[in-house]
Design a protein with these regions (language model features):
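Short, non-ligating residues that shape and space the ligands of small metal-coordination modules
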Residues: 104-106, 146-147
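Transmembrane alpha-helical hairpins and terminal membrane-anchor modules
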Residues: 135, 145-146
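Long, contiguous alpha-helical scaffold regions
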Residues: 151-195
Length: 195
């Protein structure tokens, strides 16, 4: 048992711009009937979220889901957050934004490579405290903000704005593309997971 979720993270929006952008996206989702207008549905470990709207079926692929089904709430996070994929979120590698080479965290037998995760762990702690969260690349020696590193196997993403869809079937590619457009062309991360 558990709760499945999908997250869209805006990696570029500033802390100051996160709430206004979130309000515009929520207004669009409400106008399209994808979610309800008021936060009334409980979100696991948080306050209320937006209930699924009458047109939810237009933005999801429910072909593998038995009937009847009902989508859970949408949680909108508008604060600096490390979003994760829940259970078993253990990335294999991360790609440097400068040289584009991967820093591997595990060897071919999936044993942890000693010290490989340390720069990321330190950067996460710094980032969560409001710092830049710089990570020095083991290959090119350049330091880059944690939010600019890619990969991480869909396990982690960092940003000031995230939308978590609880208990929804897979979001359609067309919906995800329109969602990205509504975020103003910012870099986004899409993750799915389970708690």
């Amino acid at each position: 048992m558990g709760d499945y979720f999908q997250i869209i993270v805006d990696r570029d929006v500033t802390g100051a711009d996160a709430a206004p952008l979130a309000a515009r996206v929520v207004a669009w989702l409400v106008a399209e009937g994808v979610i309800g207008p008021e936060r009334t549905e409980p979100v696991l470990g948080k306050g209320p979220g937006y209930p699924a709207g009458p047109r939810i079926r237009e933005v999801v692929d429910s072909s593998g889901w038995g009937e009847p089904w009902q989508g859970g709430p949408l949680d909108v996070e508008v604060t600096r957050t490390m979003f994760d994929a829940g259970q078993w979120a253990d990335p294999a590698s991360a790609a440097c934004p400068r040289c584009e080479r991967d820093t591997e965290f595990h060897d071919e037998t999936w044993e942890e490579i000693p010290g490989a995760w340390d720069p990321f762990s330190e950067a996460i702690a710094d980032w969560e405290e409001g710092g830049e969260g710089l990570v020095r690349c083991a290959h090119c020696d350049a330091s880059s903000p944690l939010v600019d590193w890619t990969g991480m196997g869909g396990c982690f993403s960092f940003g000031n704005l995230g939308f978590t869809f609880w208990g929804w079937p897979d979001l359609t590619p067309a919906f995800l593309a329109e969602f990205d457009r509504r975020l103003g062309g910012h870099r986004t991360t899409f993750m799915s997971g389970k708690l």
